[in-house]
């Protein structure tokens, strides 16, 4: 079984923990408990290019609060996928994807070369909630739209934008989509590298390998 390390980052109260608990334990926590660090695991069988493959998802939950800024990166080494979370009803958490979280990942990318970024919008059930809309309107804001999420993902060079609600919809499908996109992007990188090597050689030219005595 293949293992994939997935680290969730983003502002506190964006729904990271609820989402992971719902995915792995099929229950929705009613009380908000701030996370320091937590690990979860989920096993999934996912079709990749028409072939069913089994994966063990190692899910790392991190604290978004500023007081954990020096500790949080300790979970980054060896990461395959970073999930950058924002909450659709919290525009500030959306802005902080670019203001904080992308910069933090970039600062530690040496410990996780090849890691891919995905932007995840949570609490989609609140996008059409009248109370949420009214509260945000009073502050001159609005629930983040799907289009805005897609544009943000493109802006920061993420693989994709996905969204879901841990309460109501689309949770397992989101993780299937993320894993499929991750492995398809890796295949494209390998294919591109192979094509570059092929084009670099002149027609009929033999490949010469130099071996050092040292």
Segments the model singles out, each with a brief description of its role:
Residues 72-73, 102-110:
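Short amphipathic alpha-helices and their capping/turn segments at secondary-structure boundaries
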Residues 63, 89, 167:
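Adenine-nucleotide cofactor-binding loop residues
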Residues 59-60, 83-87, 119-122, 163-164:
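Conserved beta-strand segments of the P-loop GTPase G domain that flank and frequently precede/overlap
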Residues 91-99:
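Central P-loop NTPase core of STAND/AAA+ ATPases
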Residues 68-91:
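Inter-motif core of Ras-like GTPase G domains
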Residues 54-68:
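Switch II (G3) loop of P-loop NTPases
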Residues 25-33:
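Post-Walker A helix-loop "phosphate-sensing" segment adjacent to the P-loop in P-loop NTPases
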Residues 1-13, 17, 21-24, 43-54, ...:
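Conserved P-loop small GTPase signature centered on TRAFAC-class small GTPases
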């Amino acid at each position: 079984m293949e293992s994939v390390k997935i680290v969730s980052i983003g502002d506190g109260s964006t729904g990271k923990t609820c989402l992971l608990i719902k995915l792995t334990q099929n229950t929705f926590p009613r009380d908000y408990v701030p996370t320091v660090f937590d690990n979860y695991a989920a096993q999934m069988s996912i079709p990749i290019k028409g072939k069913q493959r089994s994966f063990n998802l190692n899910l790392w939950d991190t604290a978004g609060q500023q007081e954990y800024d020096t500790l949080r990166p300790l979970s980054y080494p060896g990461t395959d996928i970073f999930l950058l979370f924002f909450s659709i009803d919290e525009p500030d958490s959306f802005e902080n994807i670019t203001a904080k979280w992308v910069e933090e990942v970039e600062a530690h990318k040496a410990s996780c070369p090849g890691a891919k970024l995905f932007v995840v919008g949570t609490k989609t059930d609140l996008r059409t909630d009248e109370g949420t809309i009214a509260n945000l309107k009073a502050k001159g804001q609005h629930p983040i739209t799907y289009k805005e999420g897609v544009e943000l993902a493109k802006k920061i060079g993420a693989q994709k934008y996905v969204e879901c609600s841990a309460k109501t919809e689309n949770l397992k499908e989101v993780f299937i989509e993320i894993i499929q996109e991750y492995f398809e992007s890796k295949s494209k990188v390998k294919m591109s590298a192979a094509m570059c090597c092929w084009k670099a050689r002149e027609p009929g030219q033999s490949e010469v390998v130099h071996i050092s005595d040292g």
